[in-house]
Amino acid sequence: IRPVNLLIIVLIQCLIKYLLINILIDQSALSNFNFLLFVTSTVLITAGGYIINDIYDEDVDKINKNKSRIINKKLSARIAIFWYFFLNITALIMIIYVSLVIKKIYFSLIFFYSIFSLWKYSKNLKTSFLRGNLLVSWLIALSIINLGLFDIIPKIDNNNLSKTVFI
């Protein structure tokens, strides 16, 4: 798990929420509590992605990063898999709750997609230079786009849609 990268995600989402969305939108859909759950879900899924990546990279890391590897050195693969599932399930419970609160349950599918994509990347896409890098770039962008979806879209009704889009 890369704590600095996780902190960057938190900072970017907080900056977008409090310095952009809350200033531009009269009333956003996410309360501070639901925003906390949203950010925590994003961080937990990202941390889970790091764990599954380390699990699949264990053999390569034995050679390339023997001193810094964690799986089967500091943490067994079995325990790492437990944490992978625990983090992702916890994140999904949180984001499903937030999706229900904002009455957009289908938004939670984006987080299911992110979990699947991180697993797919770790399993076999990271060896494909272009596809792997494009997927990771897309998932990073999606972590920012998601905030707009969850915080702005639920507050836009059909009458105000054209005003919001073209302002």
Show the residue positions of the predicted features.
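Multi-pass alpha-helical membrane architecture of UbiA-family
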Residues: 1-167
